[in-house]
Amino acid sequence: MQEVDDVAHAVVNGFGVAGLAIGVVKGEQVYTKGFGVKSIETQEPVTANSLFHLASISKTFVASAVVQLAEQGKLELDAPILTYLPDFILDDERYRQITVRQMLSHTAGMPDTDDYCWDRPEYDDQALERYVRSLAHEKLIAAPGEKFAYSNIGYEVLGLLIARTSGQSFEDYIEQHLLRPLGMNSSTFLKMDVAPEHATTPHILLPPTVVSPEYPYNRAHAPSSTLHSSASELCSWILMNLNRGELQGRRVLQTTSFEQLWHPYQQTGPSHPDEFVGLSWFIDTYRGQRRIRHDGVDTGFQSDMVILPDHSIAVVALANTIPAPMNMIMNAIVDLLLGLEPSIPKPPVLMSMGTILSAHGIQEAVDRYRHLQETGADQYDFDPEQFLDIGYTLLEVRRYDECFRTAQLGLELFPDAPEIADLLKQLKSRVGKA
């Protein structure tokens, strides 16, 4: 798999990504490898067994657990959530209509959150239940079943649903009924159970790449976000999905349950006309092939998982740096598996300008950009989208000064780009910086 290694090395060397782990499945063949480092401070190498925070890929485990409980007769997917969580309350009478299936498919009309309190995490057993109780003041943003609206909040409610209907904590149920039966013995939703020798550190690309002062963990948001796993163990998860519920003779889901999990329930929006949401999973096409996918991003970590079930191929990529070019990575490796010529990602031009921008200011960075346009057109990616990718990342992790400089530079280079102007407006509304 030298070509896979070439893609990974290009990302680590050219995109400021501290560490990256790749898992590839083709039929029953599995290839896993780590690249880069777990932390730029320790320089310990990433391996296929290094544990990464997965962010929203966690939701695919939640959905499988809920469907598993439905198989056991402990809940019905089309029953109202209130049937199993009678104390669940929103400040909107329509919430009484929300079904389990609607919550799983992000069609419940639930709002979302942009504050996970990573800087003030809760670790106790009651954290999830307290969070769900705190939603009593929230209102729906649409009628249940009306449209797709991605909601992390909805998956916290589903986590409590798993706990109530199983009689176990959310984390214990997932561990005993999904992770351990699949041999995913190092994987865990509990940060305190992450083996230190396998742990990875979150990083942020300013540029340059720095260690994040926050770690994305809060037990109140475990179901939506906090599974830790490795490329090696996630390949077991992928194989179970490709085999429709079975791994090495151990069945954790009925074959027919994948008709529910991968059913295209609702189009996600007009900007993605061929993308639909299933039960947690997203369904679209790539190169004319059906693709099942989920990705994730939180402070310092980014992940992506792609399954092409009709070809029995899949890829997972885990990075301990944001932003990371996950689409480029996944598309290049999937192309390889399909027998196509991959496009090796070019590093963003911002990578060669970040320290100039912070140390010497806008004008020198502009001059550097113009020079590279003339001399390095084949070496760098000059897409203005990179200013948005890095800018919004910096905004979300509250690195406002760096965000401001990045947006200013982008606007200087692309004065007619309304998206960059919008980034500056959002920054101004956040902190009053003009």
Where are these regions (language model features)?
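Active-site-proximal loop and beta-strand segments within enzyme catalytic domains
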Residues: 14-15, 26, 37-152, 168, ...
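Catalytic loop of the DD-peptidase/beta-lactamase superfamily, centered on the K-T-G motif
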Residues: 1-33, 118, 122-123, 163-176, ...
